Amino acid sequence: PAGWTPIDTTRPFYRQGYDDPRGYPYVGHLWYRFQLDVPAAFQGKKIMLCVPVVVTEAWCWVNGQYAGHRPYQEAYVRPAEFEIDITPLVRPGQMNLIALRVDTSLSPAQAAEGIQSRMFLYSPK
């Protein structure tokens, strides 16, 4: 989306040069926004959002509406997926906006990792 800096979601946030003012790896909240064109074929189907690796706590909004939360999970715990039913909030056949807030501030000794995978939508059979 306009006004946002693109970053690689397959690498830890702290490995991409975003340091705090003192030069240390950033620790705190990260915001991610994704625009997704959801195919009209999804109409009437259950739609799940899956982020295979997100460290350490995450909240999700779809088209400006709160969708849910994945509670804090230590960074070393795997799998670290965030999977949520977003069916009532998605508009199939249109562009949709997904926002994820990731909090990495619960452990000051841990640098911000954030999303480390490509997210995807699917419809269970």
What are these regions (language model features)?
Residues P1-Q16, D20, Y72-Q73, P79, ...:
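An acidic-aromatic loop/edge-strand motif
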Residues Y24-Y26, P39-A41, C50, E74-Y76, ...:
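Generic marker of residues within folded, mature protein domains
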Residues A67-G68:
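Short hydrophobic beta-strand segments in globular cytosolic domains
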Residues P25-P39, E81-I84:
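Short beta-strands within extracellular/lumenal beta-sheet-rich domains
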Residues W4, G28, L36-G64, I98-V102:
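Aromatic-lined ligand-binding clefts that engage carbohydrates, nucleic acids, or primary amines
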